[in-house]
Amino acid sequence: MHVKNYKLTLDKKFCVNCQICSLACPKEAIIINSQLKDKEKNSKKIIDIDLEKCNFCGICDIICPFGAIKLAKNGKNSISVLEKNSFPQLIRNIEFNSISCPKDCNECENACPLSLISISKKDYDGKIVKDINKMSLTQKQRVKIELNIKKEHCPTCRVCEFKCAPGVIKVKKNIEGKIIINQEKCPKECKECVNACPIPEAIFLSKDSKKVNVNELFCVYCGACKVACPVKNALLLKRTKIYHTPTHSGAWNKALERLTSKANAVKELKAKGSLKAKEMVSRKVLFDEVIR
């Protein structure tokens, strides 16, 4: 008898205690427990997985924007829903223009809030450049720059894009949405959501009003702020679009409805249906032309 040994691993370094995996789980096996974090009583949410409910499908692994959950089967990374093409992957579209990148700049490396970026600089002979400032202008011009990003952990916040020189890095968010702060309900000087946010510049406390403000430019709509907020309806999160690889799956349709809304799920279904109809028409036209 062949025994399958499954192992789920949560990397606490990358887990931001958001709600994505919990919402996407078809078995409702993932819950978020509240614990006291420190003396200031800032809440810290801890993920708990009910192994009796979990069927080890791997959806939590592939849907996590931060790549914090890993599923292994018999010691190897094996995800059944990917193998069967019954669930999509998040698209992490990151472009790097090495020609436009200043030779002596490390801004993107320093700016990444999750320390996912490393830059390597090599001279004409392919040797690592340790101190570019000691090189002549001619030597600098021949330096090749490589941008290394741990893409599986990148939530596409775009901080690197805006901190870097124009045109060097382009990042397309894989989740779009909107966060609304009800300032009447938001307690003055409360920083629960600010402390929970994994992207420091996405949500912040105003120096003037002492109330929370959101910078949608860098927000990844993970929901960590919503989970941490102690006041009901003080912070509202709406995900409107999730960019993913192609799939035709009932499991994804249900997950999309929970992650965004029923309207968005229906909209995507209609778009897929329209695209499929166009493909069928194109094939028929091509078939008719071949017959002629």
Which residue stretches match the model-derived regions?
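Flanking helices and flexible, charged tails adjoining ferredoxin-like Fe-S electron-transfer domains
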Residues: 1-6, 13, 40-292
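The feature marks the first
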Residues: 4-7, 13-36
